[in-house]
Amino acid sequence: LDHVSESIEAGMTWHSVIEKSERYIRRHGGNPAFPCTLSVNNIAAHFTTDHTLTPPEGVEEMVLQKGDLVKLDIGVHVKGAIADNAITIEIGNGGNHTDQIRAAKEARDASIEKMHPGTPWHEVGAAAEQVAIDAGFQPIRNLSGHQLEKFNLHAGVSVPSHDCGPNHPGYRGVVPSGGIFAVEPFNTTGSSGMVENMS
């Protein structure tokens, strides 16, 4: 993740970053656990040029520009053992998105700090939400982290990034002992805290 993110710069195509990421994984003995995704600016997550070379709605061309907010999400598996990692960067490090990037990292850390066996999931989400709100952002409520198991990227348990309450059907129960999780809090400058186009 660091190798690729440190080499991203203005003028690169979205597709070239994705190809570079997947080549690096294979060159080092792994395989992509899912198509590498590169989501730019108001695209919150899960966009990959592996599915299309047609720009998404509102994007003229898929070339990185100085000041773009880029979310790079890479999954690796080695003999079925999966790692799911993401990083958010600003192209050119102009400081336009520093607070938002910091808030996402701090929300992740706050969630991890809460994740002890027996902790209700809604308390994990509440910790992430509080960090986002204190920093002036909204958590994205319909994107979440997830459990990882061998050969299973989404293993049934979701990790909330907002205070969903103790009775939310998607986040009932408590943090189990021995689980492996991708903790993925998303935040937004928008008011709804929801991703509107999930296609």
Residue ranges with predicted function:
Residues L1-S199:
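Active-site neighborhoods and metal-handling regions in enzymes and metal-associated proteins
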